[in-house]
């Protein structure tokens, strides 16, 4: 039975026994909700998400493209793969580099 995490995101259909799953474990989510693309899933239960955004350069009154990479926990019930568009939510630090957890993954069209 999946618990309500307080976001307008449906619970995954699969079950898992991961303690760091926000739906089936005890990990609370709070803070930022971000969307990005998975660029790596080689680590165990971890994915790397890349976000692209525009930054204003005030001297030239133009925008420049920037990107950032964020490490996030990937529960077994969601299992995002490279190329998927994922929604991640901020949580307490899970490890030295992971403070986000994947809450939704969708395959791009």
UniProtKB/Swiss-Prot annotation:
Keywords: Ribonucleoprotein, Ribosomal protein, RNA-binding, rRNA-binding. One of its GO terms (biological process) is translation. The keyword rRNA-binding applies. InterPro entries: NA-bd_OB-fold, Ribosomal_uS17, Ribosomal_uS17_arc/euk, Ribosomal_uS17_archaeal, Ribosomal_uS17_CS. Pfam families: Ribosomal_S17 (PF00366). Transmembrane segments: none annotated. One of its GO terms (cellular component) is cytosolic small ribosomal subunit. The keyword S-adenosyl-L-methionine does not apply. One of its GO terms (molecular function) is structural constituent of ribosome. One of the primary rRNA binding proteins, it binds specifically to the 5'-end of 16S ribosomal RNA. Part of the 30S ribosomal subunit. Belongs to the universal ribosomal protein uS17 family. This is Small ribosomal subunit protein uS17A. It comes from Methanosarcina acetivorans (strain ATCC 35395 / DSM 2834 / JCM 12185 / C2A). The lineage of its organism: Archaea, Methanobacteriati, Methanobacteriota, Stenosarchaea group, Methanomicrobia.
């Amino acid at each position: 039975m999946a618990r309500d995490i307080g976001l307008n995101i449906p619970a995954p259909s699969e079950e898992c026994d991961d303690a760091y799953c926000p739906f089936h474990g005890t990990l609370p989510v709070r803070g930022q909700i971000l969307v990005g693309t998975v660029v790596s899933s080689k680590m165990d239960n971890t994915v790397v998400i890349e976000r692209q955004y525009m930054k204003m350069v005030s001297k030239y009154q133009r925008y420049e493209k920037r990107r950032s990479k964020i490490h996030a926990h990937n529960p077994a019930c969601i299992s995002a793969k490279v190329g998927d568009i994922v929604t991640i939510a901020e949580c307490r630090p899970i490890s030295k580099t992971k403070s986000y957890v994947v809450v939704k993954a969708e395959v791009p069209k």
